Amino acid sequence: MSNDLLADLDRRMDRLRHRAKRAAEVLRGSAVEVTEYEPQAHGPLVSFDGLDGYEEVDRYWVNAPYAFVYIGYDGANDEHRYHVVEPGLDDFEQDLLETLYDDIRDALIYDAVYEPEDPESVLKEQMKQLLEEYGVEIGMNAFYRLFYYLHRAFEGFEKLDPLMQDPYIEDVSCDGYGVPLFVYHAEYTDVETNVSYEQEELDGFVVRLAQQSGRHISIGDPVTETTLPDGSRAELALGEEVTPRGSAFTIRKYSEDPFTPARLVDLNTFDLDQMAYLWLAIESNKSLLFAGGTASGKTTSMNAVSMFIPPRSKVLTIEDTRELSLYHENWLSSVTREAIGEGDDITMYDLLRSALRHRPEYIVVGEVRGEEAMTLFQAMNTGHTTYSTMHADSVQTVINRLENDPINVPRAMIQSLDILCVQTLTHVGTKRVRRNRVIAEIEGIDQRTGDLDYSTAFEWQAADDSFSQRDSVVLDDIREERGWSRSELLRELRNRKRVLHYLTQQNVEDYRQFTALINEYYANPERVVERVKAELDEDVVVDAPGVAE
């Protein structure tokens, strides 16, 4: 008899023994009374005494009362450690968890169409019924520790769930089998965690992430990029064909509450003068491009300044993976799609061509990398206001990328771009920060040399972490288009700066509140300015070289 047949026979016998044991348990029965978890009555679900060799610098809940994060600091090696603390289980509870998981999973597979409104209550009821069938009596402390792991498995991201729940984490990276995950933490930057995956577990998890987001991944097609159900971006690799250390993934977490311009000012990514300038430029239909390296904040900034788009304007966004979140009523969002069955891929180029038929006033493209850039600049040249991002570390690099393969935008068409913001992820002291390094203005083609001319309107000064401002061609263009005098232009900038200063001073980080005041300003600027002036601790000064009263 072959080994395969013997293994199959063993599996069948195990199932028969399992069913017989289950039948005996059902006949015996038990009664489980489930009550709400109360820390004083039931005791803590999780505890932790710290890590040897590490000084505790932070501890906070990510899923109270089940899981918290411990941040330790190793002074000898000058490094932090991110340690996830979850409920402990003894051997009996671990076996019970596996049995519950199998039975609940089977029920979910059988009833896959059913989506309960309150999955937590349904899960608790399923656990109660199964425990009664098993004849197992457990206390509420053990019940809720088991509940945590089951809920994490069926409704969350399994062992990755605490990291996905942590609001301070921006990126999560898994580099292979048995390798600790690394996270990019808003406070402690790149940190090693105590979370890792073995081969079978990691392969299954990568496949699950792909399937949950409607993508296919296999050994024959081992790499895919996708958007997870919660909106996070994920780059997935399966097996060892393209990633020799094993399956891997990188997740760029999605924030349900996007950064506002006030938040970017508070972080000193931009200053008030830059943000007032961008507000007026966006209102005046100037096209913008945000450039920078990986994790420099390009998309975050573009998403933030889109809150300045006038409320009734039609906005259309085009993305490979869903990142943009506009609080705008007249907004049409579109995302690329891989071919399904015999259908064709729907690319950014296809979506951009289609977008022009929707007659949008503002077109926002997640990132330009190829042929869609030509259509984007054609849209600019035909009067559409467009915003996008690009990977590049300087103004000249942006121009070089646009003019050469694979993008190949003619120099004459690049003239239609008005403003170029270049962002960077850098250090100020011991902290890693994001700064808008330069705001450049495209002035046109030099008739003498044939080169594309640009000037710098704002520039970050690394020495004192401040921003300097120079003359602005864009502001002069806006003044002429609006028929304003220089003093009227200065007043418009000052009023916008007052509103932004007020929003920053009031710590208005909720994008709904921020957008509400911006929209109110568009409806009645005088009323908003008077209210803001009355509530400000001090008035603002507009530093606008070349714009004198």
Please annotate each region the language model reported.
Residues 277, 282-291, 302-427:
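Switch/coupling sub-region of P-loop NTPases
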Residues 419-504:
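Conserved P-loop NTPase
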Residues 495-549:
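Terminal-proximal interaction/regulatory segments of ATP-powered molecular machines
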